[in-house]
A protein has these predicted regions:
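Active-site neighborhood of thiol-dependent amide/isopeptide-bond enzymes
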Residues: 45, 49-110
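His-Asp-centered catalytic microenvironments across diverse enzyme cores
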Residues: 2-5, 9, 103-185
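Solvent-exposed, charged interface segments at domain starts and junctions
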Residues: 18-43, 79-100, 117-141
Length: 185
């Protein structure tokens, strides 16, 4: 498949069509992604052997889209964020990776202001949130607190871990050591 076909396949699976970039469209994409694409670790196990041989632990975008659209799979935060980044980029969004310590990949989308987008945290995050504004969301399982204080962003899941979000955009190549280490089990 070519890029246009891959984008259309991804959008069709999400139940939408291409629109001009906007916060409304971004939120529509996030909600559909969260509802339709699974967070799972089976694909990490599947991709590990190839990754140990090649150093590339992530599937091609064509493989990723095929897995979500025909096999009901998704991935971890890394795979889901990479796939969503690819989609948003191809739709014209200004999107970057961000790292959350320890061990989490999420996205920054710049529109009228920068937004925090996280489709790989298995949290009740069904929309984009202004990157530098605190917020809290809850569901029957947990409370997710995003606290901005003195240029530092602390994210707490209750129950669950506390992490620190680094808002500077990163490149996946700078995360190679961390990615390799996360597959050393």
């Amino acid at each position: 498949m070519n890029q246009v076909q891959l984008v259309n396949s991804f959008l069709s699976f999400l139940g939408t069509t291409k629109q001009p970039t906007s916060l409304k469209f971004l939120n529509e994409l996030i909600k559909a992604h969260q509802e339709k694409i699974k967070w799972e670790t089976l694909t990490k196990i599947i991709d590990r052997e190839k990754g140990n041989e090649t150093g590339n632990y992530f599937p091609s975008i064509e493989t990723y889209i095929n897995r979500i659209t025909t096999k009901g799979l998704g991935g971890t935060c890394w795979t889901c964020s990479i796939g969503f980044h690819w989609l948003l980029s191809n739709l014209g969004f200004n999107v970057h990776y961000m790292y959350m310590d320890p061990g989490h990949l999420c996205l920054r989308v710049n529109l009228d202001q920068p937004y925090y987008v996280d489709v790989g945290y298995c949290a009740p995050l069904f929309q984009a949130y202004p990157l530098y504004e605190s917020f809290q969301v809850s569901n029957v399982r947990e409370t997710f607190t995003y606290e901005v204080s003195n240029n530092r962003i602390k994210i707490t899941r209750d129950p669950g871990p506390t992490k620190i979000l680094h808002t500077d955009p990163i490149h996946l190549s700078s995360m190679k050591e961390l990615i390799t280490k996360s597959n050393d089990w």
